[in-house]
């Protein structure tokens, strides 16, 4: 059954919040993105009637780059908006709501990209700020070849069952005006490329981009930074850019020295990278893959299979790596499974020292397969995937199941030393230790019920403990005495034959 459970790192919880990212067509102005976000907010309330308490939208980039460093967001330009949807009921099934919104919004707003990020704090931490648990990175010196290869991977990844919101974080077709100055024309009128760039920057972004100008207030002695720029309403067309005056480094009051940008440079519309990410100095592209309706381990296996099959199409000197929460899940599973096996081995060795026997500890740990079977059935029947909390619960179950089994075997040893009948000793041990074993197991099972029936991330732990301990208790009371009787009846018979 363990192979049919599926694998997750940590289960998703019902937080009552949906975090959504909207990306309008590249180059959309900030005011248009804001109006579009308002329309989308209204559509969300229509798609989820009576389920929305409030929607907060945040469009565009912050004024300073320092604020962006502390906000885990895929926003790269004015066309991006982050929408935080607060639900009326904190226990609402956010995964079902995401499915409804993803389908409905895509149909209503073609050309706009919608992705969903984890809303609970644990998933955000495990993703290291990334918007998805799987981050496939293409890193290499040839940026354009890497981008085309990343697009091929995206097409393959979108066919994976359970893979949703498969997007490339970096864009390569952001609408941009390219101003290419003509050195020959510029030198003919005593203008350089620096003169063109300085005047264009001063007109569009302000004088502080070229040179900082301070004014000293003689009355207070305080200095004020003065920023001079052309009002944005006057720079609203290509013609207004072509008529930007370009002065020379040599000041002259003559009118014939005034030159326009359109006479000295060519303006053309092109598509350029919206954001450039570097890894080890080389350009890097992030392919984000989210998971919906399937376990993370299954989707990761398919992603790794496709990535391996596409190795021969990889650009020269490029590297393909998988990061994010999914890569950490492998290490966590290996460590927890090793810890589970190490716990069983250490418990066995400790019992060997205590009982001064290799056989009795083996009989004691025969209850542990029942615990594993109970864990598998409990997770399977409750539709709970295997996760780190579930494996932690398995380790807890091993200790309690072993302690109960020790009670039965230790009493059976006492009885067999008195009358020498292994079968009778096993029966007496099962009857006498029935109440203590049942009380110990019941206390832990009932104590885990609130956790198992809740919506926290530790719910798989409680379910694993309840299922594992329930079956392990049956094994302890019925199977372990049978194994003890079977093993020791043969030993007692051989000892009697040797004595005779």
Task: Describe the predicted segments one by one.
Residues 2, 6, 10, 154, ...:
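Alpha-helical membrane-interface segments at transmembrane helix boundaries
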Residues 1-28, 66, 70, 92, ...:
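Transmembrane helices with small-residue packing motifs
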Residues 1-11, 53, 107-108, 112, ...:
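Signature of alpha-helical transmembrane segments and their immediate interfacial
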Residues 1, 26-38, 457, 482-500:
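Interfacial helix-loop-helix hairpins and adjacent transmembrane helices
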Residues 32-128, 133, 155, 184-210, ...:
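Solvent-exposed, membrane-proximal periplasmic/extracellular interface segments of envelope transport
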Residues 349-433, 438-457, 463, 467, ...:
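Hydrophobic transmembrane alpha-helices and their membrane-interface caps
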């Amino acid at each position: 059954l363990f192979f049919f459970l599926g694998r997750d790192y940590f289960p998703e919880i019902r937080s009552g919040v949906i975090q959504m990212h909207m990306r309008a067509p590249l180059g959309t102005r900030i005011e248009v993105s804001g109006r579009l976000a308002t329309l989308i907010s209204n559509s969300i309330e229509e798609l989820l009637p009576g389920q929305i308490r409030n929607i907060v939208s945040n469009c565009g980039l912050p004024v300073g780059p320092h604020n962006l460093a502390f906000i885990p967001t895929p926003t790269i330009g004015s066309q991006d908006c982050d929408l935080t949807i607060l639900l009326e009921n904190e226990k609402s099934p956010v995964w079902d709501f995401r499915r409804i919104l993803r389908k409905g919004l895509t149909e209503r707003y073609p050309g706009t990209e919608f992705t969903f990020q984890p809303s609970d704090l644990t998933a955000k931490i495990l993703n290291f700020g990334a918007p998805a648990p799987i981050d496939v990175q293409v890193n290499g010196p040839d940026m354009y070849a890497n981008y085309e290869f990343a697009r091929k991977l995206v097409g393959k990844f979108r066919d994976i069952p359970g893979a949703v919101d498969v997007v490339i974080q970096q864009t390569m077709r952001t609408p941009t005006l390219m101003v290419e100055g003509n050195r020959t024309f510029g030198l003919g009128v005593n203008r350089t490329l620096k003169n063109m760039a300085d005047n264009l920057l001063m007109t569009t972004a302000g004088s502080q981009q070229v040179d900082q100008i301070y004014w000293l207030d003689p009355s207070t002695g305080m200095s004020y930074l003065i920023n001079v720029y052309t009002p944005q309403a006057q720079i609203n067309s290509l013609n207004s850019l072509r008529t930007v005056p370009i002065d020379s480094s040599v000041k002259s009051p003559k009118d014939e020295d005034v030159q326009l940008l359109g006479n000295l440079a060519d303006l053309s519309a092109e598509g350029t990278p919206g954001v450039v990410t570097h890894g080890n100095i080389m350009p890097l592209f992030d392919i984000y893959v989210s998971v919906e309706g399937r376990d993370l381990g299954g989707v990761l296996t398919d992603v790794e299979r496709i990535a391996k099959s596409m190795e021969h199409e990889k650009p020269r000197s490029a590297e393909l790596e998988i990061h994010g929460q999914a890569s950490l899940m492998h290490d966590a599973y290996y460590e927890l499974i090793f810890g589970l096996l190490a716990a069983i081995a250490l418990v066995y060795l400790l019992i060997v020292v205590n009982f001064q026997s290799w056989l009795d500890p083996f009989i004691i740990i025969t209850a542990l397969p029942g615990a594993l079977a109970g864990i598998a059935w409990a997770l399977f029947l409750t539709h709970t995937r295997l996760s780190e909390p579930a494996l932690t619960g398995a380790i807890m179950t091993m200790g309690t199941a072993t302690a109960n089994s020790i009670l039965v075997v230790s009493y059976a040893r006492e009885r067999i030393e008195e009358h020498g009948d292994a079968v009778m000793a096993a029966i007496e041990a099962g009857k006498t230790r029935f109440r203590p074993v049942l009380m110990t197991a019941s206390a832990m099972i009932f104590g885990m019920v609130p956790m198992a029936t809740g919506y926290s991330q530790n719910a798989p732990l409680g379910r694993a403990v309840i299922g594992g301990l329930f079956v392990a208790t049956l094994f302890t009371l019925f199977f372990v005495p049978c194994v003890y009787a079977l093993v020791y009846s043969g030993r007692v018979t051989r000892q009697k034959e040797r004595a005779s």
